C-alpha cells in the first residue's frame, strides 16, 4: 500500500542532526535528540492520534493507541531509535531517485557514487523510489525510517477505524548507536506483552538472535629507559600490547567471520613505551562460547603477568548485552505473528541472526520479548546509505498487520 505522508515525514526527520556522542555522560547523550523528541516527535505523535503522549527522563517519547476491538487483548509495542551513527549528520541533503533505472547513482557533487558493481543490493531495486545521501553525510535511515514507518502506521489506523487492532504502545528512544539507549528503558511503564524494534535492514528481515557482547579494556604498564642501555631493563608497553594481540586467534576477526561465528575486534590502541591501552569488543552467539572468549583474554593476561614477574597487564571486562534468543525462544508468539503477517503480505521472511545488537537485546532481558523487523535501510552508517520507499511502505503494512492479527 502507498502512504502519502511517509516520504515527506522521513525526509523531515533525516534533516535533523541527532548524532549521538559516546563520550557524553548525559541521557540522551546529545541535546539534539532531546530537541528532536520534544519539538518534532511529541507534537506529531499527538497529531497522528496517539494518546497519553509523554517524554521520560530516560530520553524515550512514549504514546498509546488504545485497542478498538475488545477481543484483541494483546498489548504490542513498537520501538525505534532517534540517534544516528558516528558519521557526519549535519546538513543531510537527501536525494530522491524515482523509478531507479538500475544504474550508477551520483551522490550529489561529492564525487562519490552508488555503483551496482560495488553495492550488489542495488540489483533488487530497479523501478523503485530510492532515497540516498548527497555524499557528504549519512542518511539516517537507521533508524528514522523505523520512526517514520511506526508514525505512518498509527496515522493510518487512526484514519481507518474499520481496521480492528489491539492496544499499541510506541517508544522512540535515544543512543542506540552507542549501546546505552535501552539501559534506562522503563519496561514496567511501557507495559506490553511483547514488542518489536523496527530497526532492521532489507525487506523481510525478522530477527530474534543477536550477539552477546562485552567490552575489554587493557592497560599495559611498561618501564622506559634509554634505548642505548635498555637491555634487561626496558619493558615496552607497546610491545606488550602487540604480544597480547598476537595470542588471540588470528582468524577470529570481524573481517574474517560471518553467520554464527564470533570474534575479537581491536577497536583502538594508544600509548608509548611507558604505558599503552587497547580496547576490544568481544562478540559471540552461544553463551558458552561468549564466556570462553572472555576467559581466554583473562588467561592471556594472567599468563603474561606470570612470565613478566609482575602485574603489567590489567584487563577490565564489561558485559554489554546478551543474545535475546535466550528470552524469545521461551515464547515464539511475536515471531509466529510477524512471520504469518509477512507471508500473508507476500513478503518472504528472512530469519537470520543479527551480527550486532539492538535495543531489543536489552529490553528482552527486562521482561519484554523484543525481536527486530525490517525498516529498509541499506549500507547504513555512512555516505552510501540508502532506503527504498517501497520497502518502507511494506514495513508499514507489516506493522498494521501485526496489530490486527487475530490468530
Curated annotation (Swiss-Prot):
Q: List all membrane-crossing ranges.
A: none
Mind listing the UniProt keywords for this protein, alphabetically?
Answer: Aminopeptidase, Cytoplasm, Hydrolase, Metal-binding, Metalloprotease, Protease, Zinc
The compartments listed are: Cytoplasm
Alphabetized HAMAP family for the sequence: Aminopeptidase_M20
> Which CDD domains does the record match to this protein?
M20_peptT (cd03892)
Per UniProt, where does Zn(2+) 2 bind?
142, 177, 381
* EC class of the enzyme, as a word: hydrolase
Q: Name one GO biological process term.
A: proteolysis
According to its UniProt entry, the function of this protein is described as: Cleaves the N-terminal amino acid of tripeptides.
* NCBIfam families with a match to the protein in the record: peptidase-T, PRK05469.1, PRK13381.1
Domain of life where this protein originates: Bacteria
Q: Which reaction does it catalyse?
A: Release of the N-terminal residue from a tripeptide
Question: What protein am I looking at?
Answer: Peptidase T
Task: Give the similarity note.
Answer: Belongs to the peptidase M20B family.
| Cofactor remark | Binds 2 Zn(2+) ions per subunit.
Alphabetically, the GO molecular function entries are: metallopeptidase activity; tripeptide aminopeptidase activity; zinc ion binding
